[in-house]
Amino acid sequence: MAETHSLGTKILIKIIRLYQIMISPFIGARCRFVPTCSCYGIEALKTHGLLKGGWLTLKRVLKCHPLNAGGFDPVPPKTNNNDEKK
C-alpha cells in the first residue's frame, strides 16, 4: 500500500529532488556523509514527516562542513511514543 505524505512533505521532497537533478551534478560530490544529505533528507521526510523529518534534515545539513569528518549517519528509525513512556 502506498504511503501518504502531507503536502508540505511532498513539496520539500520535490525541492530536494530538484536540487539533486539540477544543481548537484554541476557542483560535484561534496557531502561528507553516507547516505548523502539529500538522500538523508528524503528518507527522513518520508519516515518522520514534515516537522521531525525537516528538523533532522536541517541538523544533518548543518553538520556537513569541512570541520566534520562525516561518515555513516543513517536516519534514525521511527519510534512508537507509547513505548517510550513505559
Swiss-Prot record:
Q: How does it sit in the membrane?
A: Peripheral membrane protein
Where in or outside the cell it occurs: the entry states:
Cell inner membrane
SMART domains linked to this entry: Haemolytic
Lineage, top-rank taxon, reads: Bacteria
Looking at the Swiss-Prot or TrEMBL record, what is one Pfam family this protein matches?
A: YidD
Q: Name one GO cellular component term.
A: plasma membrane
Give start-end ranges for the coiled-coil region(s).
none
Alphabetically ordered keywords of this record: Cell inner membrane, Cell membrane, Membrane
Keyword Cell membrane listed? The answer is yes
Q: Does the keyword Metal-binding apply?
A: no
The text of the family note is:
Belongs to the UPF0161 family.
Q: What does this protein do?
A: Could be involved in insertion of integral membrane proteins into the membrane.
| NCBIfam families linked to this entry | membrane protein insertion efficiency factor YidD
| Name of this protein | Putative membrane protein insertion efficiency factor
